[in-house]
């Protein structure tokens, strides 16, 4: 049961400091990742994606709203924020959730992100504020 608590606690800590110093050891080497923009396999590709966010986005932040484990599945609800490196530096927000599946060794073998908005909604945030 200690391992069960550890992965949830590790994920909570990773969300708090996202995208800095993520704990990649909780992922299987061949982890499957999918979100509305990407679909790939492998922890190295996952590391590259997180490094891209860390390098090119301004002030990225992940607010964790909830985390729940049921059997071999962990569900998180979150909002990802960042400023895009455009001259007017718009603040972007993507609310969503993740479904993480664990193997028998308690490693994440599947990480699928879902957004509560469309890709077009994200593009629009770069040019229109909610007050317009």
Label for each model-derived stretch:
Residues 1-132:
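C-terminal and inter-domain tail/linker signature
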């Amino acid at each position: 049961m200690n391992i069960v608590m550890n992965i949830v606690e590790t994920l909570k800590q990773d969300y708090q400091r996202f995208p800095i110093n993520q704990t990649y050891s909780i992922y299987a080497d061949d982890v499957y990742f999918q979100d509305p923009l990407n679909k790939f396999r492998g922890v190295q590709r996952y590391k590259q994606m997180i490094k891209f966010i860390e390098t090119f986005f301004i002030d990225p932040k992940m607010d964790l709203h909830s985390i729940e484990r049921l059997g071999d599945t962990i569900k998180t609800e979150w909002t990802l924020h960042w400023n895009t490196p455009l001259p007017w530096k718009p603040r972007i927000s993507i609310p969503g959730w993740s479904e993480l599946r664990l193997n028998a060794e308690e490693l994440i073998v599947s990480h699928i992100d879902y957004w509560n908005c469309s890709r077009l909604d994200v593009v629009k945030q770069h040019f229109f504020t909610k007050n317009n």
